[in-house]
Amino acid sequence: IKKNYKAKLDANFIYLPAPLDSKKFEKIDNIEKKKNQIIYIGRDSYEKGIDILKNFESKINGEIIYCTDSPWEKTMSILKASKLLIVPSRMESIPQVIKEAFYLKIPVIATNVGGISEIVENGTTGILIPPENPEKMIDAINNLLDDDLLIDQLTKNAFEFITKNFTWDVLL
């Protein structure tokens, strides 16, 4: 982002991403993971791609929980109990929910739109899927649900990335 604006405007910028307040997570209870529980967190809107997810829900080897209007602590408790987070967006900046999932060590499968690829590195911190590609999303979800080794690798890398780059302690 900084490079693009510097080139266009010939000005110096400081890129300050929205931080993650890791202290807020101390309030979230330890919850046992639910086998193959998948979570969607976001608005019920076209931009967020919730309709795409609902259209192929029956082809998923798990249960999708939709958190579209819940208080933050309740949503984070459900996220913490989930096996993975799905972000099927058509348009997006850098979703805070991905940072939250990284911090809670929940793997992320997201569409490669907007700023998502600035934090989700495909195969390293999460899985990126081309937008509007339900078949690839279905395959990625079902494959990841069955691959605990990959889940461990992704969540370890994602947690390390988020704590080194996006917490208040690092940014201040």
Feature names for model-found ranges:
Residues I1-E26:
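Donor nucleotide-sugar binding/catalytic pocket of nucleotide-sugar-dependent glycosyltransferases
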Residues I31-K48, K54-E57:
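Conserved donor-binding/catalytic core segment of Leloir-type glycosyltransferases
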Residues M76, P95-Y103, S117-E118, T124:
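Short alpha-helical segment that forms part of, or immediately flanks, the ligand-binding pocket
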Residues S77-S82:
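Short alpha-helical donor nucleotide-sugar binding micro-motif in glycosyltransferases
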Residues R90:
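Aromatic "clamp/platform" in nucleotide-sugar-dependent glycosyltransferases that forms part
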Residues P107-A110:
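Short hydrophobic beta-strand element within catalytic cores of glycosyltransferases
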Residues N122-G123, I127-P134, N143-D148:
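Conserved acidic donor-binding segment of nucleotide-sugar-dependent glycosyltransferases
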Residues K136, N143, L150-K164:
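A short, well-ordered alpha-helix in the C-terminal region of glycosyltransferases
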